[in-house]
Amino acid sequence: MNSVVLLLSVVCLGVSSQQITDSQRLFSIAVNRVTHLHLLAQRLFSDFESSLQTEEQRQLNKIFLQDFCNSDYIISPIDKHETQRSSVLKLLSISYGLVESWEFPSRSLSGGSSLRNQISPRLSELKTGILLLIRANQDEAENYPDTDTLQHAPYGNYYQSLGGNESLRQTYELLACFKKDMHKVETYLTVAKCRLSPEANCTL
């Protein structure tokens, strides 16, 4: 009898270890993808800023600080301490919402360079990867909306009339918000991945 119990314990441990290994692999892929997108966003924003006059940079930055991004509609941790206290599933759900919110706006960032043309397909790959992670980490004890039913408000002031330098401001806001949101997703996925290693230090 004892040998049977021991055998079942070993089998269960093996299955559990395999699930953790699979999740770690999926997390590694997702983190790599969002890291690439964040670096891409930083480069595109930096290149765009470099093309502006000093006064244009100052004015656009001032306007942006008073404006808002689509991510402001998505409830997320307010600081690093809340991020660390959030569950894996919550961090994944927020990340999914942030990535999904860029499906349409990302089309406005495409075109003109090979870097920009990487955005939409890489966002799609990342969204698929996060969805797989959500399903793999689904816990009935946690009640989060189905990802298919997540709704997001229109993208900031992007669809509103912006006045004189409308095109310039649109591009600045899109790139700045994209960079900001990819940094958020990178942080959330990195913390969630770290949770799979009990001995790891997940301090931000």
From Swiss-Prot:
UniProt cross-references to InterPro entries, sorted A to Z: 4_helix_cytokine-like_core (IPR009079), Somatotropin (IPR034975), Somatotropin/Prolactin (IPR001400), Somatotropin_CS (IPR018116)
UniProt subcellular location: Secreted
Protein's UniProt name: Somatotropin
Signal peptide feature range: 1-17
Organism: Oreochromis niloticus
Disulfide topology: 69-177, 194-202
Name of the gene encoding the protein in the UniProt record: gh
Family: Belongs to the somatotropin/prolactin family.
A GO term, aspect molecular function: growth hormone receptor binding
Keyword Cytoplasm: no
Main location: secreted
Function as written in the Swiss-Prot or TrEMBL entry: Growth hormone plays an important role in growth control and involved in the regulation of several anabolic processes.
Positions bound to Zn(2+): 36, 186
Modified residues (Pyrrolidone carboxylic acid): 18
Gene Ontology terms: biological process: animal organ development; growth hormone receptor signaling pathway; positive regulation of growth; positive regulation of receptor signaling pathway via JAK-STAT; response to nutrient levels
